[in-house]
């Protein structure tokens, strides 16, 4: 139940495809995949196979997040663009992972929302700094404003946008 709800929330927040990679048998993998609602599953997958599959997905242009908890997941966790381990997982999985979740799977949704908010803020600030600095450069070049004023405004806008970057993220969950 928890896994199905988490996957539905992740899809609402931009996750396009969920693939389950497991060392379990075909029957066990199919049963779990159907129960939780993954898009695709692969059974009887060895650790090196998980790593290879991650790299194939990346080579095809996908950004890959790997969630794992065991020693066998460690190579794939290391290869993924974003890797998440559970607190109760193996020491090596937690060490290799970018993020260790201290609790339940619902925290994956929070992490995804934080990532979405961070990317949105980075893009907004990037466009703001390019816009402001372009205007100030143009103003200085055309003598609409003095060069010293343009340089001052450039630095002031950079500082103001840097301060904005430090503000708390506005995280909105889609339900």
Language-model segment annotations:
Residues 9, 99-175:
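Membrane-embedded transport module
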Residues 1-72, 76-82, 99, 113-116, ...:
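Cytosolic catalytic headpiece
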Residues 67, 93, 155-156:
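Acidic (Asp/Glu-rich) catalytic motifs at the cytosolic membrane interface
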Residues 21-24, 88, 157:
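Conserved phosphate-coupling serine/threonine residues in phosphotransfer and NTP-handling enzymes
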Residues 44-51, 88-91, 105-106:
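Short, acidic/turn-prone active-site loops that include or flank metal/cofactor-
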Residues 90, 97-98:
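Anionic-ligand binding region
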């Amino acid at each position: 139940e928890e896994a199905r709800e988490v996957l539905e929330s992740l899809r609402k927040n931009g996750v396009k495809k969920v693939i389950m990679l497991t060392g379990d048998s075909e029957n066990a993998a199919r049963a779990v995949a159907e129960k939780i609602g993954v898009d695709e599953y692969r059974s009887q997958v060895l650790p090196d196979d998980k790593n290879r599959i991650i790299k194939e997905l990346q080579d095809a242009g996908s950004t890959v997040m790997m969630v794992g908890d065991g020693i066998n997941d460690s190579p794939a966790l290391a290869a993924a663009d974003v890797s998440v381990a559970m607190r109760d997982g193996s020491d090596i999985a937690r060490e290799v992972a970018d993020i260790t979740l201290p609790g339940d799977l619902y925290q994956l949704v929070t992490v995804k929302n934080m990532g979405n908010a961070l990317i949105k803020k980075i893009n907004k600030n990037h466009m703001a700094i390019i816009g402001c600095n372009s205007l100030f450069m143009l103003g200085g070049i055309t003598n609409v404003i003095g060069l010293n004023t343009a340089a001052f405004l450039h630095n002031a806008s950079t500082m103001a946008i840097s301060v904005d970057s430090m503000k708390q993220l506005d995280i909105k969950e889609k339900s």
